[in-house]
Amino acid sequence: MLQEAKVSTHTSNPLSQSVPQYGHSFDEATRVERLDSAPESLASVASTKLKDTTVWYRLAIQSEWCSTPQVPHGGFLASLLLSALLEHQQSQQHPDPYTLSYDFLKVLSPGEAFISVTSLGKVSGSFTSIAAELYQSRKEKVLLGVSVRGSFVNLSKQQGKSVLPLHYGAVSKLEEVPVPHPRSWYLPPSQAMISRQLDLLVKLETQRRPFSDYFVRFHPDDVDTPQQEDYSEEHASADLQSSPHYCKGSRILPLRSSHSRRIDAKSIPMFGDFRRPAYENVIKQDPCHPHDVPTRKFAFPTLQYTIRFLAKVPHDTEWLHTQWRETVVDGRIISDVYITTEQGAEPVAICQLDSLMFDMQWALSTMPSAEKSKKSPEASQL
């Protein structure tokens, strides 16, 4: 998930010697620039917001952080929004994220985009409520791609039992996370696809899948895939204690790679959905194009994504231990993700993804190809 671009030292730039040998692409890709005013292309949107409490940021959605060449990775977009929120809150009384609830509304494209951050005021003396929206201008139209609403706190001042509003209540393990009924407000455009899947999956009632355990980190030199180690009972040993080079109950992990970016709060949204990226949808306009062949039988575009931060991510954290539980409910897949540190000693966050499940092969077969659509109205069959 991390590209480490070597910076050339053979340059006429006098500042080149101060540049580190490795540049972390995640930090570059999630960088936001604060604007003095709303961009002209979003004037119609800016007129509906309070100028005194709204701040605008400019950013670039990079193609390297896409599930497909033109579909941004949902976890990356979530981290982009959190980057703007952290930038906005860094000098405020409450600098740490506590709860974030994302709604994925429209599929955006690589290119320039803008984020509006609006302070909703202090709901109490313990936390601040804040909202952000990710926009993109396309063909003189304004697209609202992702919106997020959440609360920020000062985790260093939290002592004893929390009085903040909790999404799940006190949770110390994945089994304690409830499975609520999905309540998504926005659906993909193809109603036929939705109806077909609802008819099929409603008959299954509720199906709970087994737990899945992963150890994940930023890959030292690959921007496209996370480096992960699957949980294995064969490598578990009750007698062997955890150490800097061994995670109890897992394979031996190279924990001390100097080239792997350390994990922080900004990267949690991306790690929370690495196994099911929001916007994971490789259906394109031309199903016969060689790059449009589906990579899996089913696609799971995420509609809602909620994160509750349980604690600050410890300094120098390289690996995270993630537990996944999936539940099929009425045409949706509810994914609960419990995230702890590499040794499982400290819980970091709980994530929940509400995703739509549909058969990609069926969907592709109902979409006309670009060439055949001119000759015949019949659907293309793969």
Swiss-Prot record:
Q: What induces it?
A: Expression is strongly induced under conditions of nitrogen starvation. Expression is positively regulated by the cluster-specific transcription factor rua1 that recognizes and binds to the specific 5'-T/G-G/T-C-G-C-A-T-A/T-C/T-C/T-G/A-3' upstream activating sequence found in all promoters of the UA biosynthesis genes.
Which residue pairs form cystines in this protein?
none
The pathway to which it is assigned is: Secondary metabolite biosynthesis
Name the residue ranges with Polar residues bias. Answer: 1-20
The record's section on SUPFAM superfamilies has:
Thioesterase/thiol ester dehydrase-isomerase (SSF54637)
Q: Tell me any Pfam family this protein matches.
A: 4HBT_3
**Region (Disordered) spans which residues?**
1-22
Q: What does this protein do?
A: Part of the gene cluster that mediates the biosynthesis of the glycolipid biosurfactant ustilagic acid (UA). UA is a secreted cellobiose glycolipid that is toxic for many microorganisms and confers biocontrol activity to U.maydis. UA consists of 15,16-dihydroxypalmitic or 2,15,16-trihydroxypalmitic acid, which is O-glycosidically linked to cellobiose at its terminal hydroxyl group. In addition, the cellobiose moiety is acetylated and acylated with a short-chain hydroxy fatty acid.
**Name used for this protein in its record:** Ustilagic acid biosynthesis cluster protein orf2
Organism, scientific name: Mycosarcoma maydis
Q: What is the lineage of its organism?
A: Eukaryota, Fungi, Dikarya, Basidiomycota, Ustilaginomycotina
